[in-house]
Amino acid sequence: MKKEEVYIVDFKLENEEIIKQYFYKWIESRRHIPKNFTKEIRLMSVRPYYMPCYVCNLKIQLDYTIRVQKRYKIRRGMSTIIDDNEMFYIKDYSLFASQVIPRYDMDQISPYDFSKMHISGDETKDAPKEKFIQVYDDCINHYKGAVMKKLEDVINKKLLKQNTKEMKKKFYKVKSHEIIDEEFYKVLVPVWVCKYSYNMKTYYCIFNGQSGKEFGHTPSRKIDKIFISVVIFLIIMIIAVFYLYI
């Protein structure tokens, strides 16, 4: 079943100055960054956005095969195969559909509390809303691997309950699965985007507008070329001295 309305999850963090504090705290926490990076960056903008997301509830029927190996100290018994079927449910699963922010980046600032969503049009913060350009089917196909990983987790948890500690459990293969019921909603989620520059390049850090959870990109520290040259020179000298005295 499909809900035609566009829902919205409003900002819990609405103060731009608070987001700036979060940003600089995140910068200070970064490791393996260039020397003087924290002093030379320039924060260019801090802006709120509502990003598109499909939130779905899935009911999946699957048949699967599990390989179970008996282990006792050093000795191992023969592998056995368990074939079973399961009804699997996913509730409030996020399928991010933004063309502006990569899906991977949005995944890193999840989850959102979708119990707080309401119909769009009555939001407290005035912020740009990205349109739903990507369709639901494309999003569910993109996330198929992640859904399968959840199936693996469910199956392994079931085995943990059924078998003793002497059993080594391994997810072997999903033979077939079928989504027999699905329900999805169009939801706009709150995001703060911090745009900053360093060494003439632009970088971004995004914050979950509900929880403040962040994810961003920073340049990596490059090993000094002079340092590398000195190390190579010393290695050559050591080898030369070694051969001289042999």
Regions found by a protein language model. Give the residues of each.
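C-terminal single-pass membrane-anchor helix
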Residues: R221-I246
